[in-house]
Amino acid sequence: RSIHQGWFDGTRPDLDLYDSPLKWLLSNCKLFRRDLVETHKLRFPEDMRIGSDQPFTIEALVRAKRISVLADYTCYYAVTREDGGNITQGEVEIYTRLECAERLFPFIAGLLEPGPRRDAILHRHTMWELTKPLRENLLELDEDGRKDVCARVASIVDRYVTDDVMALLPIWRRVRLRMAQRGDLERLYEAIRADAAKTAYPITLKKGRVYLRYVGFEDPAAGLPDDLFEITKGLRRRLKEQVRTVEAKRVGNDVEVTVRTPLTGPDADDPATVGLALAPRGVKGRTPVEGTTLTPDPGGQGVTLTARIPLAPLIASGRGKHTLRLIVRTSAEDYDVAVPAGMTAVKGIMWHRAMPYLLTVHGDARGTTAILTHRIGPRTVAGRVRRATSKLRGGGN
């Protein structure tokens, strides 16, 4: 089974259930003291079709005086399935998952008083058991079935899922749960279909904060607060997935680059918030690209940045390579993201102080937009001229 190996690569005599990955590892593949099992009469609820090991394991971990990791010797051997999975992975009927959640939430609430410790455990079950019924297979049910599932999920949210737990979830999970809780089924179905189609959502910058324009965002009829859509982590990943240099061209002794972004909102076209910079090879600092033009997309899908970069300063810096960076400033953090290349490469010869240089704008080995300026000798220039002349003559014939 795939587990957090970092916590189990050495002996840990006293592991905290609430501040460790243990709450995500609730199978019964552990060693339990007999007196713990018998004192608290720990048993598997055999009527649960899936997840029957969880009540046993959770109560054992909650009631244990100490939880230890023993890595000094092999305690026992576990034989995995051929696919490395377990009964709760893969295709499980939606009502089976829902019934599992309906058993686990009140069980945990009976073990732990409301507060951070209960929330730490229920975070795990809200993340997995409670949101899985709100995936694509929900749409395979008839309307009565869909309403029944959503009403039962909503009942669990109402009783057990605090705002603190909700804030820990990925945006799509917490928004779907709130939609189910509000009975907003049409928007819930829309969100499920959009995610199934791998929709790339714009990112809104507003008052120093960052939001995902997921289904229901800034929709008065949906009645969902903005903070439900706030991106608190993972912005760099989202930007790297959606930002691209879509065009690069030589303009005299400059290079003009066009970068498409998913950024929208009142702050997205503010140069104080969004801009471009160059990262010289071998230097930690960034050189801002001055005079960048920010143009909002008419359809509200993003902002396009266009900048003309003088080549002479790049050559004079003595650094043969500069990579393009997108800078996004928010109230919480400044984001510095390498801009992936999605354009046709540019190559040519330019002169600086009577010396020839080879200019290349392309995607480097990591796929990042890079501007390369390398000094070349007269023979190389002559060879390029001969090849170009030969091609022209060949085209003329």
Pin down the residues of each PLM region.
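Donor-binding/catalytic cores of nucleotide-activated saccharide
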Residues: 1-110, 132-138
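A broadly tuned preference for mixed-charge, low-complexity surface segments
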Residues: 43, 120-129, 185-190
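Short, solvent-exposed segments of well-ordered alpha helices
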Residues: 95, 121, 246-249
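Inter-helical turn/loop segments and adjacent helix faces that build the functional surface
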Residues: 111-117
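P-loop NTPase catalytic cores that bind/hydrolyze ATP
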Residues: 117-141
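Basic, ligand-binding patches in group-transfer machinery
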Residues: 136-397
